[in-house]
A protein has these predicted regions:
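Conserved, mostly hydrophobic/aromatic
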Residues: 6, 32, 79, 135, ...
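Conserved N-terminal beta1-alpha1 strand-loop-helix module at the mouth
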Residues: 1-67, 72-76, 80-83
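Active-site beta-loop-alpha junctions enriched in small/polar residues
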Residues: 7-13, 45-47, 68-74, 92-94, ...
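Histidine/lysine/aspartate-rich catalytic loop segments that bind and position anionic ligands
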Residues: 120-172, 176
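Catalytic cores of alpha/beta
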Residues: 72-85, 127-139, 180-182, 186-200
């Protein structure tokens, strides 16, 4: 059964233009956990404010804390000092924020984190078996498979082909004892489609969670997504 991870990045982005309570993740932490979420994530940066105080976050929630980090050594080192549970390397210059491997610079970043006790390292990849195998050889703790492409298909055949590519990659990862997460423009329909064919460690949801909560309320939306993720 997958765990539910709430990606707070869209909420933080909303906070730049409004002071609504829903735009401040600190207001939502204990509430998010109470409705069944097991993880939270956000991208490291000055605009995240108090979210960078992981000690404070731990006093407010038992959720796994996943900090998304750009492929930059200085930024990674700063994020590591916060001592989250896991850091996920992402390429913020790419539309789907995936990294590409093999890459000498990515390997150097991974090696920086690998031997740190009680800190996991993840990378965000396209659903590509070759890159997955590269990640395995690097000793990565967890792979987040980008599902963005799935959201862009509105016709059945390309949708099913994309879904097959994603599930095949995830199957290979699980077979090799890799922890696999999935995220990227996921809504309830896409989560149901994934859950019908594959099991992952975490399912990360952000934009769809925010947009639906603005219409139907955060509590109802969180419960709704948690139920969809929880159904196997």
């Amino acid at each position: 059964m997958p765990y539910f991870e709430v990606n707070f990045d869209p909420f933080i982005a909303l906070g730049k233009i409004t002071n609504s309570p829903v735009s401040n993740p600190l207001n939502l932490l204990s509430f998010v956990e109470s409705v069944g979420a097991a993880g939270i994530s956000f991208t490291y940066g000055p605009e995240t404010g108090q979210m960078n105080n992981v000690t404070l976050l731990r006093s407010m929630t038992n959720c796994r804390i996943n900090i998304r980090v750009p492929v930059d050594m200085q930024v990674l080192q700063k994020a590591v000092l916060l001592r989250p549970d896991i850091v996920t390397l992402c390429d913020m210059e790419r539309e789907d924020t995936t990294v590409q491997i093999p890459s000498k610079s990515i390997k150097e970043l991974v090696d920086t984190v690998l031997n740190i006790e009680d800190l996991g390292i993840a990378i965000r990849l396209k659903p590509d078996v070759k890159q997955l195998k590269e990640a395995y050889q690097m000793g990565i703790d967890e792979i987040e498979i980008a599902t963005n492409e799935l959201a862009h298909h509105d016709k059945q055949t390309p949708f099913l082909e994309c879904l097959e590519k994603i599930t095949h990659t995830i199957h290979i990862g699980i077979k090799n004892n890799l922890r696999i997460a999935a995220g990227g423009e996921l809504d309830r329909r896409l989560i149901r489609a994934l859950n019908e064919v594959i099991d992952v460690e975490f399912i990360s949801v952000g934009k769809a969670l925010l947009s639906r909560s603005l219409m139907w309320g955060l509590e109802n939306t969180l419960k709704e997504f948690n139920e969809v993720i929880d159904i196997r």
